[in-house]
């Protein structure tokens, strides 16, 4: 089969020919239809410090996908050949304290699909059946292919009650844009998103934000007070950028008693005004991945109840043009980029 692999240290991803993997007794063999390029895949492509310290090479990459069950192990129950599935990319141990308590997203021994074990940028993927999520028929392939990052957005956005609240999101990447759409869908009052990338701020507008703010040119507090008539600060914050200055600004504009969810990963140490955190009595929660599998059920329900993610999907390529897909991601002028394993050449 064909697969996209990190074959050696250094920049790049390579198309290779390799053997179709054999499922173990508790595994599914999934034939991949479509995949999506994640920021993690870009880190691996660029071979930055995180990637070089984390990913063994060679490694088939990718963890955002939709496919169909093509085979299964002898112990698998509840799936049939031809079932359309996506899957949880964090493979947990099942025996640590958190796993045994049903909190698998907190597993200390998590392995990442496409990071620590072979990934989904391939014609076939082997995945523990426990990790597979059977998809409702009314969720299209393009949307199903981005369920993994959508899950990050849903986990972050639904960490706190949003009904009637004023929400600040820092970082208008695809996950930030999807989190904004979730916040509006479930009843937030104002949803404000900040970034310095005009392309991505425009995507956020298409996803329904109240106001998109380029903080390189506009003052966030002025927008909040003068345009939106908000004089006490934001109730809920979602930090999606990994930017230290963005997080510092978020802390400064939160209302007393505000709640902050952190998904963005900083590239280095970040200075925090702990006095503001203490005297405003802020709640800060770290987010990693998705709750298994409550987040997945909520994702499906949100789509089935009318949440539209299609504006965030901006590029499609056949697998023969995978390099163009990575180039689009590297440009910073894209939302989600879909790679079609059933088409050689296609772009939009």
From Swiss-Prot:
<keyword id="KW-0560">Oxidoreductase</keyword>
<comment type="subunit">
    <text>Homotetramer.</text>
</comment>
<feature type="binding site">
    <location>
        <position position="107"/>
    </location>
    <ligand>
        <name>Zn(2+) 2</name>
    </ligand>
</feature>
<feature type="binding site">
    <location>
        <position position="200"/>
    </location>
    <ligand>
        <name>NAD(+)</name>
    </ligand>
</feature>
<keyword id="KW-0520">NAD</keyword>
<keyword id="KW-0963">Cytoplasm</keyword>
<feature type="binding site">
    <location>
        <begin position="263"/>
        <end position="265"/>
    </location>
    <ligand>
        <name>NAD(+)</name>
    </ligand>
</feature>
<feature type="binding site">
    <location>
        <position position="96"/>
    </location>
    <ligand>
        <name>Zn(2+) 2</name>
    </ligand>
</feature>
<comment type="pathway">
    <text>Amino-acid degradation; L-threonine degradation via oxydo-reductase pathway; glycine from L-threonine: step 1/2.</text>
</comment>
<feature type="binding site">
    <location>
        <position position="38"/>
    </location>
    <ligand>
        <name>Zn(2+) 1</name>
    </ligand>
</feature>
<feature type="binding site">
    <location>
        <position position="99"/>
    </location>
    <ligand>
        <name>Zn(2+) 2</name>
    </ligand>
</feature>
<dbReference type="GO" id="GO:0008743">
    <property type="term" value="F:L-threonine 3-dehydrogenase activity"/>
</dbReference>
<dbReference type="Pfam" id="PF08240">
    <property type="entry name" value="ADH_N"/>
</dbReference>
<feature type="binding site">
    <location>
        <position position="64"/>
    </location>
    <ligand>
        <name>Zn(2+) 1</name>
    </ligand>
</feature>
<dbReference type="InterPro" id="IPR050129">
    <property type="entry name" value="Zn_alcohol_dh"/>
</dbReference>
<feature type="binding site">
    <location>
        <position position="195"/>
    </location>
    <ligand>
        <name>NAD(+)</name>
    </ligand>
</feature>
<dbReference type="GO" id="GO:0019518">
    <property type="term" value="P:L-threonine catabolic process to glycine"/>
</dbReference>
<feature type="binding site">
    <location>
        <position position="93"/>
    </location>
    <ligand>
        <name>Zn(2+) 2</name>
    </ligand>
</feature>
<feature type="active site" description="Charge relay system">
    <location>
        <position position="40"/>
    </location>
</feature>
<keyword id="KW-0479">Metal-binding</keyword>
<feature type="binding site">
    <location>
        <position position="63"/>
    </location>
    <ligand>
        <name>Zn(2+) 1</name>
    </ligand>
</feature>
<feature type="site" description="Important for catalytic activity for the proton relay mechanism but does not participate directly in the coordination of zinc atom">
    <location>
        <position position="148"/>
    </location>
</feature>
<dbReference type="InterPro" id="IPR004627">
    <property type="entry name" value="L-Threonine_3-DHase"/>
</dbReference>
<keyword id="KW-0862">Zinc</keyword>
<dbReference type="GO" id="GO:0008270">
    <property type="term" value="F:zinc ion binding"/>
</dbReference>
<dbReference type="InterPro" id="IPR011032">
    <property type="entry name" value="GroES-like_sf"/>
</dbReference>
<dbReference type="InterPro" id="IPR013149">
    <property type="entry name" value="ADH-like_C"/>
</dbReference>
<feature type="active site" description="Charge relay system">
    <location>
        <position position="43"/>
    </location>
</feature>
<comment type="similarity">
    <text>Belongs to the zinc-containing alcohol dehydrogenase family.</text>
</comment>
<dbReference type="InterPro" id="IPR013154">
    <property type="entry name" value="ADH-like_N"/>
</dbReference>
<comment type="function">
    <text>Catalyzes the NAD(+)-dependent oxidation of L-threonine to 2-amino-3-ketobutyrate.</text>
</comment>
<protein>
    <recommendedName>
        <fullName>L-threonine 3-dehydrogenase</fullName>
        <ecNumber>1.1.1.103</ecNumber>
    </recommendedName>
</protein>
<dbReference type="InterPro" id="IPR036291">
    <property type="entry name" value="NAD(P)-bd_dom_sf"/>
</dbReference>
<feature type="binding site">
    <location>
        <begin position="287"/>
        <end position="288"/>
    </location>
    <ligand>
        <name>NAD(+)</name>
    </ligand>
</feature>
<dbReference type="GO" id="GO:0005737">
    <property type="term" value="C:cytoplasm"/>
</dbReference>
<dbReference type="InterPro" id="IPR002328">
    <property type="entry name" value="ADH_Zn_CS"/>
</dbReference>
<dbReference type="Pfam" id="PF00107">
    <property type="entry name" value="ADH_zinc_N"/>
</dbReference>
<feature type="binding site">
    <location>
        <position position="175"/>
    </location>
    <ligand>
        <name>NAD(+)</name>
    </ligand>
</feature>
<dbReference type="InterPro" id="IPR020843">
    <property type="entry name" value="PKS_ER"/>
</dbReference>
């Amino acid at each position: 089969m064909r697969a996209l692999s990190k074959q050696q240290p250094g920049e790049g991803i390579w198309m290779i020919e390799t053997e179709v993997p054999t499922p173990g007794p508790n595994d599914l063999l999934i034939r991949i239809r479509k995949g999506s390029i994640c920021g993690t895949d870009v880190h691996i492509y660029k071979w930055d410090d995180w990637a070089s310290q984390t990913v063994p090479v060679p490694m088939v990459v990718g963890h955002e996908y939709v496919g169909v069950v093509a085979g299964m192990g002898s112990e698998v129950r509840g799936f049939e050949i031809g079932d359309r599935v996506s899957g949880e990319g964090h493979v947990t141990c099942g025996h640590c304290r958190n796993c045994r308590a049903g909190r698998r997203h907190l597993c200390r021994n998590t392995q990442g699909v496409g990071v620590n074990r072979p990934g989904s940028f391939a014609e076939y993927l082997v995945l523990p059946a426990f990790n597979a999520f059977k998809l409702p028929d009314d969720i299209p392939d393009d949307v199903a292919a981005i369920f993994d990052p959508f899950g990050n957005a849903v986990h972050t956005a639904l960490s706190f009650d949003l009904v009637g609240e004023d929400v600040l999101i820092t970082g208008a990447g695809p996950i930030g844009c999807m989190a904004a759409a979730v916040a509006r869908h479930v009843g937030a009052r104002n949803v404000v998103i900040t970034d310095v990338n005009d392309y991505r701020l425009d995507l956020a507008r298409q996803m329904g934000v109240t106001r998109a703010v380029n903080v390189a040119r506009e003052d966030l507090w002025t927008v909040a007070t003068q345009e939106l008539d908000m004089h006490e600060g934001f109730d809920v914050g979602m930090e999606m950028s990994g930017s230290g200055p963005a997080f510092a600004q978020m802390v400064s504009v939160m209302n007393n008693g505000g709640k902050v969810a952190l998904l963005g990963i900083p590239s280095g140490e970040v200075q925090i005004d702990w006095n503001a955190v203490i005297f405003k009595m802020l709640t800060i929660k770290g987010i990693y991945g998705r709750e298994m599998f409550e987040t997945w059920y909520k994702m499906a329900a949100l789509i089935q109840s009318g949440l539209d993610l299609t504006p965030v999907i901006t590029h499609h390529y056949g697998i023969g043009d995978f390099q163009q897909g990575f180039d689009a991601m590297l440009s910073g002028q894209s939302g989600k980029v879909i790679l079609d394993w059933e088409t050689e050449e296609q772009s939009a």
